[in-house]
């Protein structure tokens, strides 16, 4: 299957930098991947086919560095505002659409299944594929000013990069229906950071002023065992049937 290209895609780059964790009380280095479309505050970062390929390569390159952990974050105030829909008209056949979906799936799956711990620092707005990127990481911090949503249903889509399967297991089927369906159909209501934290979509919340520093310290605490994250697997919750009926 050939690569799909959006001629008008505003391409998001994925740059890697390493941070020595010794100052934070852990061994090794943290490879931080920053995704950025280079347009500062004038346009939120979005994720088209080339952008996803860039993230995929960055994950591979970061893994090859053999760091103690890998983290993904965004440019100031933005993680990612979802898939780039500007080029959706080029998807004129099923194979092209399948390519876009599978490329996102396979890229995000690397974060879920990585033997190196993966973290997402949700430093700002996370919508759609941006939220799914965060959910695919094994640990998440969120800035107190961030807003989070899965708005796909509002435009007749579903969270196609695994959010629809990850979120119910993470926060329970009833809560997932609220986030995926009810919020989308209620004028695209977004979750505030503290709401996402309460639901279990994030592990820690920090203020923007020292968000990155505290997020790195959180990574170190997880790695050295000072911080234990306990999660419930909602796969067998009794309210699956009622949640499916509501959906």
Where does each model-flagged region fall?
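Gly/Pro- and small hydrophobic-enriched strand-loop and loop-to-helix capping segments
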Residues: 138-160, 164, 173, 200-215
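Amphipathic alpha-helical segments at domain termini/boundaries
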Residues: 1-34, 132, 176-247
């Amino acid at each position: 299957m050939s690569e799909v290209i959006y001629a008008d895609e505003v391409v998001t780059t994925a740059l890697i930098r390493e941070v020595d964790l010794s100052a934070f009380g852990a061994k090794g280095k943290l490879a931080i991947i920053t995704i950025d479309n280079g347009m500062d505050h004038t346009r939120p970062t979005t994720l088209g086919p080339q952008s996803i390929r860039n993230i995929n390569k960055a994950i591979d390159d970061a893994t090859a560095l053999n760091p103690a952990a890998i983290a993904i974050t965004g440019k100031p105030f933005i993680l990612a505002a979802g898939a780039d829909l500007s080029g959706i008209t080029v998807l004129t056949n099923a194979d092209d659409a399948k390519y876009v979906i599978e490329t996102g799936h396979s890229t995000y799956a690397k974060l879920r299944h990585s033997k190196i711990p993966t973290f997402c620092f949700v430093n700002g707005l996370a919508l759609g594929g941006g939220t799914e990127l965060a959910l695919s990481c094994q640990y998440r911090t969120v800035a107190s000013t961030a807003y989070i949503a899965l708005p796909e249903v509002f435009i007749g889509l579903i969270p196609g990069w695994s959010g629809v399967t990850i979120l119910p297991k993470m926060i329970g089927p009833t809560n997932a229906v609220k986030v995926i369906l009810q919020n989308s159909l209620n004028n695209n209501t977004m979750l505030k950071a503290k709401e996402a934290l309460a639901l279990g979509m994030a592990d820690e919340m920090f203020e923007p002023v020292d968000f990155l520093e505290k997020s790195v310290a959180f990574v170190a605490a997880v790695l050295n065992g000072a911080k234990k994250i306990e999660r419930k697997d909602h796969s067998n919750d009794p309210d699956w049937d009622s949640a499916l009926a509501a959906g």
